[in-house]
Each structure stands twice: as C-alpha cells, then as structure tokens.
Curated annotation (Swiss-Prot):
GO terms for biological process: protein catabolic process. Its main location: cytoplasm. This is Leucyl/phenylalanyl-tRNA--protein transferase. Belongs to the L/F-transferase family. Keywords: Acyltransferase, Cytoplasm, Transferase. The keyword Transferase applies. Functions in the N-end rule pathway of protein degradation where it conjugates Leu, Phe and, less efficiently, Met from aminoacyl-tRNAs to the N-termini of proteins containing an N-terminal arginine or lysine.
Amino acid sequence: MTKRLSPQLLIYGYAQGIFPMDEDGQIYWYDPDPRAIIPLDERFHVSSSLQRTIRRQTFEIRFDTAFRETMQACSERDETWISQEFIEIYSQLHAGGLAHSVEAWQDGEMVGGLYGVGLAGLFAGESMWSKARDASKVALVALVERLRAGGFQLLDTQFITPHLATFGAYEIPRAEYKQLLVKALQCSATF
C-alpha cells in the first residue's frame, strides 16, 4: 500500500512489472500471476466485422490530443480504480511524453478511446472506454499498429477480459512476463 503517487514512483513500478490501483482512497500495487498481454505479431486478431468498420472510417483516430479527457471518461463508471489523484499523476507522465491516449472521434466529439504508459519497448494499457459501438475497439487496433511501427515489444493489459481475448490477448505466468519485460525495457521504441 502507498499513500501518495509520483511520476517517478509510477515509472519505477512499471519497470518492476507492478502497477497501482486506487481502492477506497488507498493505493495498492499489483503484480498478477498470470499476467495478460496482447500479441504485437500476427497473433493479434481483428474480426472481419471490425475490419469493415475500420475500412468505413467511421471514426477519426487521434493520438495524445485529449489525454486528460480520455482518463476522465475511463473513470466515469459505477466502480473505478481511477481517482482524481491518478488523473493528475498520469497527466504529468503524459506531459513528460510517457503516457499516451488513443482517441476515437466522430462528428467532432470524442466517443471512445484508451490510455496507457509507454516505457522503452513496453506499453502498459491501463483502461478503455466507449460510448459509440466499436469506438474503443478501433482505438485498440490503431494502438497496436502504432506500437508495431514504433518498435514496441510488449503490450501489457494486466488482466484478461473476454473483450481483449477476442483480439488474441492471452495469459502468461508472472515469471515469463518478467522475462519479456526485461527485454522490452532494453529496446528503444517511439510512440
């Protein structure tokens, strides 16, 4: 348990393979076993219906234009681990070029997106939101394309969900995750 967060503490945590969540005003650090990742190779799967949505260009995808708003939207649920303190600290990481958002826009309005932390060749996906069908899914596909182009090695999703499994996300033992993390932190990548 931690009382306060700082950008430096967050970066240290991600480099060790742990991540924070706020529960009832207390900050806890997690190191799940197993750990979920999304493959950045040919195992990443996009359904044919989602491919059609992407081809129709239903959404305009933007990167890092509404980071704070993306986090705020991710936090607006009945139960959330994203406190205002988290929004402030991650926004500081964003200002330093280490946290990023992918936003789906439609008719001038942001209708979905995601955010996460990029550290060397690691991208730790933190949360997604959507108020238009497929908006966050299209944002995830755009994220994977960007990570591939930038030389990222590891897309950490922390926990598996049925939604992420449709893209090919899978679980690996903590020890294997730590090995992949060490390799990812040794490479240079650009978001």
